[in-house]
């Protein structure tokens, strides 16, 4: 049920400051200027959609974890990119997420349980510990290009590319063109 558990275990072993980045997420520019100040940050907040982020009554397979000790109104973070600048908070978050997974060995809804452990708990832990948490962007900026070319997140487009080789080829060509434009010396090494 916990397909991304490896990321959380790895994060638990890496001291802050550190970044956790999904393989379908591209940072085209340095983000160090965006990370000055927060204890933790993620690419954007998520709306609380009950089908993905249900209330605590949905976690019937979780035993011994204090679900009621968290604020369920806090918007989850999308952790395709997550930053941890405060080591004490990083440890608290990873310990909490790993404890939740261990308390849910018979999780019956892989998506709900995993995004709770990885994304919703990040926001809940930050709220509970009064950690300074920041969203680096928002969905309209990511989809509309208003984030100044910092990021590409492939999301569900992966499936469309699997089903349509022309989409895949076009995406690869656009990435190659971007690499040539933004990193001419490095792209010459890669292309030849």
Where are the predicted features?
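Active-site-proximal specificity loops/subdomain of glycosyltransferases
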Residues: 1-13
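Short glycine/proline-enriched coil/turn segments at helix->beta-strand junctions
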Residues: 13-18, 36-39
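Short beta-strand-to-loop acidic/aromatic patch adjacent to the donor-nucleotide binding site
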Residues: 16-28
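Short His-Asn-centered micro-motif
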Residues: 21-23, 43-45, 84-85
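Conserved donor-nucleotide/metal-binding helix-loop-beta segment in metal-dependent transferases, i.e.
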Residues: 27-64
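Short, P/G- and charge-enriched loop/turn segments at secondary-structure junctions
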Residues: 66-72
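Catalytic core and acceptor-binding pocket of nucleotide-sugar-dependent glycosyltransferases
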Residues: 72-162
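C-terminal catalytic/acceptor-binding lobe
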Residues: 141-192
